[in-house]
UniProtKB/Swiss-Prot annotation:
One GO CC term on file: cytosol
Primary location recorded for the protein, binned into one broad class: cytoplasm
Localization: Cytoplasm
Organism: Vibrio parahaemolyticus serotype O3:K6 (strain RIMD 2210633)
Protein name: Thymidine kinase
Active site, UniProt feature: E88 (proton acceptor)
Catalytic activities: thymidine + ATP = dTMP + ADP + H(+)
Gene Ontology annotations of biological process type: DNA biosynthetic process; thymidine metabolic process
Keyword Protein transport: no
Residues holding ATP: S9, A10, M11, N12, A13, G14, K15, S16, D87, E88, C89, Q90
Gene name of the encoded protein: tdk
Family the UniProt entry places it in: Belongs to the thymidine kinase family.
Database matches in SUPFAM superfamilies: Glucocorticoid receptor-like (DNA-binding domain), P-loop containing nucleoside triphosphate hydrolases
GO molecular function annotations of the record: ATP binding; thymidine kinase activity; zinc ion binding
Amino acid sequence: MAQMYFYYSAMNAGKSTTLLQSSFNYQERGMTPVIFTAALDDRYGVGKVSSRIGLQSDAHLFRPDTNLYQEIAALHEVEKRHCILIDECQFLSKEQVYQLTEVVDKLHIPVLCYGLRTDFLGELFEGSKYLLSWADKLVELKTICHCGRKANMVIRTDEHGVAIKEGDQVAIGGNDRYVSVCRQHYKEALGK
């Protein structure tokens, strides 16, 4: 029976690596997965999912106006799809998360979503909020803070490495702009 999974973590826990490994596992068994990623994240090229360890794959793009159910149903009609993999799923809208539940419930295709739980202010992203509510399985991927404890928060920094306390929720960046830390070091960095 198909289910929807939400694999979440702070940055640098290996979400994209895990997604690419899952895709490989399906392909190795002669199955056809489909990878989607957010159009606004083009750090590694448009329509690419890349991991820090060098793995990469082409991906379909989703934008705020993409109807994921219709797009996946059309792909599935042409060729059977065995799994849908969504990278950067925190950028999904509430409606798109609902569309993915329809993929699971009507098309009977498993959907595996990978993304951040919260932003640099500790607030849930819209996509993450509804994945936490509607996913069948929640899986936390772990990374570590510089102190050795589990990192579950993300700090956005300026060009001098100083924590930023306000700004737009979405600002694409990697290790140059974001640091994963434990809650204690998050609060210390923001002066809370």
